[in-house]
Amino acid sequence: EYIEVLINNAGIRKDNLMLWMTGEEWSKVLDISLNGFFNVTQPLLKNMLVKRYGRIVNIVSLSGIQGMPGQTNYSAAKGGVIAATKALAQEVAKKKVTVNAVAPGFIRTDMTEGIDENEWKKHIPVGRFGTPEEVADLVGFLASPASSYITGEVISINGGLYT
């Protein structure tokens, strides 16, 4: 028995302008996202490679692609996972293990609680925040055998924001 599909979906925000960011705010965010990716993924890789099948999907963020003011730590952490996704995909592709990332934009979750949706949806071409179900559908596809020719990709799901 082994784990065929791994979804790395850890992340916290400790938003602050870098000028006033504490070392703890920086370290905590990077530890959860970037070190979390390593600490969960690395022990599971060997069995995926031996069995010659695996799907790894990393949940990142538009902040990791675009960078957002007040989120230098979060942007760096998610950007690091994006780079690791691309590198690891090249390491394991020949063993039929795919590694991809999903970069949600504004999705109605605890992470966007407190953000003024009416203000932000003016900037989103589809005119609304996304739903967790829409993200789950994309992740489900990437976790399936149907996605066997997709690896090392970062797929944005953001209603057309920052494309």
Segments the model singles out, each with a brief description of its role:
Residues 17-18, 25-30, 56, 112, ...:
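Substrate-binding pocket helix/loop in short-chain dehydrogenase/reductase
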Residues 19, 66-72, 94-95, 127, ...:
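Active-site loop immediately N-terminal to the catalytic Tyr-X3-Lys motif
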Residues 41, 77, 85:
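Active-site helix of classical SDR
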Residues 45, 53, 129-157, 161-162:
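C-terminal substrate-recognition "lid" of short-chain dehydrogenase/reductases
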Residues 46, 90-94, 148:
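Alpha-helical segment proximal to the catalytic Tyr-Lys
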Residues 61:
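Residue(s) in the substrate-gating loop at a strand-loop-helix junction
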Residues 116-134:
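Catalytic Tyr-x(3-8)-Lys segment
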